[in-house]
Amino acid sequence: MFPSLQSFAKKVLARQHVSIDHHIILERCGLWWYKAPISLDCKHMLIKLPNFADGLDLNTALMLATKENNYQLIKMFTDWGADINYGLICANTPPVREFCWELGAKYQVDKKKIMHIFFKLIHPSTTSSNIILCLKLFNDNPFSAYVIIREIKSCIHWKLKKLAEDTNVLSNISDGDMLTIYCFIVALQDNLREAISYVYQHFKYLNTWWLTCVLCYNKVFDLHHLYEKEKIRMDMDEMMRIACTKDNNFLTIYYCFILGANINLAMIASIQFYNIDNLFFCIDLGADAFEEAKALAEQRNYFLISHCLSLDIYSPDSSLLTLKEADPNKIYHLLKNYKSKSILAYLNYDVNNTTL
């Protein structure tokens, strides 16, 4: 199907710099999207929009237009050179699928194209804009989410495995929600604030998962936001257990400690997850369940931990017991240069006894 003269004229116009005074012309010509003019960078074939700072390549723009059932833009982007088979990926209603087929799409969705777009958006140096776009394209898109989850399942379970030791918890999550959680974790790890805020705003029904993720990934400021501002609640000791799933999670462990979580349960959880730095941090905070902890370590053949716990050389670090409120700024500054008093005691004991 050949592009219409009208589409060609729009393409030429989209390449021009048009002053704000003439934006009404662009709007009436259909060169308007997300309350902004559609601009085309022909060198890189990118659609430029304020909402997507990185720009959208034509195929991705086509997918988004299809997801939004925007027939005019579907036709225009296809005329400009987008591959209509990408549009079919996001065609979630029979009329839109029919329209894509009329424009030349194959009758089956190409799974390789789904993965191509996903990995183009989600990668180690991704941006907030990319994560938001990924969620727009693939959330509420059951087939695409199914394809992606099956392809990256091992990676997702690696990121989520300690968040949910009970595998039934993961099995009860839909593919779409699991993909959303995965994208959120990527945003958390890279501190992509715009994407994180977008998730908080648009996926409130997953709030318990957001609390779980920020506990696990040691994000004390996000934890404070969710707990104090959003009023998301969970059993205090369960919050502490989740905070103990990754080693060196001192910020979120301390936050839960100030809220009143049982530090002895945190001591036990740290052994369960074999997180030795967390264990010594709990001892610094006053944990004293040494007999129970030692028995668990021996049961699991954690001989180093068992040996550490058999020594009567530890005492709480009084400098850590000064805060009375769960203020993330104060917690951050208190622990910024934290060195474990208990680890130092163990190392000194070990050196002295080795010398002897």
Curated annotation (Swiss-Prot):
Plays a role in virus cell tropism, and may be required for efficient virus replication in macrophages. It is found in: Host membrane. This is Protein MGF 360-10L. It is a single-pass membrane protein. GO terms for biological process: taxis. The lineage of its organism: Viruses, Varidnaviria, Bamfordvirae, Nucleocytoviricota, Pokkesviricetes. It comes from African swine fever virus (isolate Tick/South Africa/Pretoriuskop Pr4/1996). The keyword Transmembrane applies. ANK repeats lie at residues 57-89. The keyword Glycoprotein applies. Signal peptide: none annotated. InterPro entries: Ankyrin_rpt, Ankyrin_rpt-contain_sf, ASFV_MGF360.
